[in-house]
């Protein structure tokens, strides 16, 4: 069973991730891509699923980071580095393939989504590392 520190870190990082996603997708990408391509993007999706999805993504990242922090280290910089690696692993092929697979998916949006997602994972990694910091053994 995970510690209270783990769950608080997931909660805080999940809230921050949702706020950032809300701003990026409603203020920037929404008007630029989503609303201008109503055939490409579903307009009837319940927004609750985006919130749930962010919390699930943060939980999975936290779980993985908890397992590999002994390799990466547990500092904020180490969490950001782990986030960068995970973000590249997840985002780079995903968004480029979306452009290759779906008619009308803008190539520019593939790169915007890739870069934004990597930065998202870096931010989440830094938050999780800061909050899940493992203390050294007592002297």
Predicted regions and their residues:
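Juxtamembrane/disordered regions of integral membrane proteins
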Residues: 1-139
